[in-house]
Amino acid sequence: MTNSKGLRRGTRYMFARDFRKHGVEHLSTYYTQYKRGDLVDIKTNGAFQKGMPFKAYHGRTGRIFNVTRGAVGIIVNKRVRGNILPKRINIRIEHIKPSKCRTDFLNRVKSNDEKRKAAKSAGQPVPALKRLPVAPRGAHTVTTQNNEPELLAPLRFEIVA
């Protein structure tokens, strides 16, 4: 058979519900409040056909620009040939969830502010707050007192017939 050109082509596993996650949607989905500027992850819920985003937006992160009674408007970057275009799409709230992509950054900002305040109140200079890669291990000496060096040599190859 030839490939169909349907909107939902190739979404058999993408839009499938998770194992043991079928049935009525939790109320927390509807009670979550979204505001303009919030970052959200688009995760299409196959149980709801209304307000479903196109498959190219599944798994993307976008910023909310409009909130209505039953849906939200989201700006998502989409690559079209060589360009990255900001696309504005309207999606129902069953298909989105708040993104956790900034939680690490916001926690780091909060901890840095606390470190700054503590240093200022103690009258000390502000410590280096930038993240650094893990440094190489420090130098150490290996003693041969109770640790005799072992001579390693390859085993001789023997043909077993």
Swiss-Prot record:
Gene encoding this chain? rpl-21
Q: Tell me any Pfam family this protein matches.
A: Ribosomal_L21e
The name on file for this protein is Large ribosomal subunit protein eL21
List the GO cellular component terms. cytosolic large ribosomal subunit
Organism, per UniProt? Answer: Caenorhabditis elegans
Q: What InterPro entries does its record include?
A: Ribosomal_eL21 (IPR001147), Ribosomal_eL21_CS (IPR018259), Ribosomal_eL21_sf (IPR036948), Translation_prot_SH3-like_sf (IPR008991)
The organism's superkingdom is given as: Eukaryota
Could you tell me one molecular function GO term of this UniProt entry? Answer: structural constituent of ribosome
Q: Does the keyword Ribosomal protein apply?
A: yes
Family affiliation: Belongs to the eukaryotic ribosomal protein eL21 family.
What keyword terms does UniProt attach to this protein? Ribonucleoprotein, Ribosomal protein
GO annotation terms (biological process):
translation
